[in-house]
Amino acid sequence: MSDRRSGLSWAVAVSLAAALLAGCAGGPQGAGREYQTASDDTDGTRRARVRIELAAAYFTQGQYTTALDEVKQALVANPNLPEAYNLRGLAYAALGEPMLADDSFRRALQLAPRDADTLHNYGWFHCQQRRWAEAKTHFAQALEQPRYRGAARTQLAQGVCLAQEGRLDDAEAALQRAFELEPANLAVAMNLADVLYRRGDYERARFYIRRVNNTPDVSNAQTLWLAARIEQRAGNPQGAADLGRQLRNRFPQSREAAAFERNQFNE
C-alpha cells in the first residue's frame, strides 16, 4: 500500500456522509435565499421532503439505487427542490454515472446558486473526477457563504483533494484550518497525520495519529499501520513493532497486517 493513498480513503466516507446529511436536513444553505417558513411548504413540497429524508437514509446505508428511486419520487412531487437534485447528484456519482451526476449538481445550482452544501458536494465530485481546478473553485465558493455551518468539513474535503493532487503544503494548510474549526474531528486528525508523514514531519504526524488511535472504536488497520510507519521513520523501531503487533492481533487478515509481516514500512 503506497504512502500516497494511506490516509485518504478513511476520511472520504466521513466527509461525504456529513455533507449529505447536512445538505438534506434543512434545505439549501447560503446567502441570497428567502427565509423559508412552514407556510411556504405545499403538500407536494412536504411529500418531496419526506422522500428526500428517506433517500438520504438509504444513501448512507449504501443503497444507492433505492436512494435514487426515492429522489425521483421526490421530484415528481416537487420538481424544483434544489436539495433533491443535490442528492441525485450524489447518488449518480456513487453509481458510477458521472455525466448524470454532473447534470444533477448543475441543476441544483441553477435553483440555488449559492447553496453551500451543493457547492461542497460538487467540489468533492470534481475531486473524485480529478478535476482539480473546478474542485478548488467550488470549495472556495462554499466557504464564502456567510451562513454556512460546514466550513470544517469543506476544509477537510479540500485538504484530502489537495493531497490527492500531490499539493502537500496546501493540503496541510487546509487540514490545519479544519482542525482549528473542529479539533475533535478524527477524520481531520487522520488526514493531517498522513500529510505530515508524507512531508517528513514525523513528530507532528505522531501527535495527530495518536488522537485517532487513542479512540478504540475509531482506530482500524489503516490508522495503526500509519502510526507504525510514522514511528519507524521517526527512528523508533520498538514503537513501530509494538504498533505492528497490535495491528496483527486486532486485524490479522488486513492488508496492513500483511505489509507489517513483510516489513514493508517504506512502501
Task: Describe the role of every protein-language-model region.
Residues 53, 87, 121, 155-157, ...:
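Canonical tetratricopeptide repeat
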Residues 43, 77, 111, 145-147, ...:
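Structural marker of alpha-solenoid helical repeat scaffolds
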Residues 43-77, 94:
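Alpha-helical segment of the N-proximal tetratricopeptide repeat
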Residues 41, 48, 82-83, 116-117, ...:
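Helix-start (N-cap) detector for alpha-helical repeat units in TPR-like alpha-solenoids
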Residues 60, 94-95, 128-129, 145, ...:
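Register position in tetratricopeptide repeats
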Residues 18-43, 267:
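Bacterial Sec signal peptide processing site at the extreme N-terminus
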